[in-house]
């Protein structure tokens, strides 16, 4: 059974932004089946801030790939913002990814020859926006993450924390339905990690939906809700008692 935060029931209406129903994922080695996700069901609603946790082998990375439309389930149903993506082919999945999801990765995934502003603007190239409008929107996002003064710097001229700020700005630039962050502070020191998670809190308070995949308790404690996986199923799904900040909902 998926968790429903009683304090936000009225705002969420009845349709989750992420609906996972009896999701199964197996990998096959010859005739041998290796089940990773074993009938997992989960609902995540608009304006939620959720951390996915679990030990190595729990299935959290596989679940992240399915949520991010980077992989498809072996069985079950996945609906993302009213789009049933369970059986979509690669081209359709790519279109959904570009439109609905903003990714933040541990390794930043910035193009080394592009400036910070050009990296942020990349999703808008695929969306067909004109160059002047792309750069204007990219600068707005860099301002949001407090990095507009580094807009002309390339990744090798930025610190790890600054690169991750660029990655967050890029994730936001296309106004996605979902921000999906995979170990976003894994390559950062503790002080910079805290600064990055404070940015995620600001994004959440602005009304964005965020899912963070992490194995670190201190990172998960920045989220409102913590879902713990073990052996391919949800072990617990609870509100985080340490979280007190509410989003500003329109």
List the predicted regions and their residue ranges.
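Cationic, low-complexity basic patches in intrinsically disordered or flexible, solvent-exposed regions
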Residues: 9
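Conserved beta-strand-loop-alpha-helix hinge in the C-terminal portion
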Residues: 233-250
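ABC family nucleotide-binding domain
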Residues: 16-229
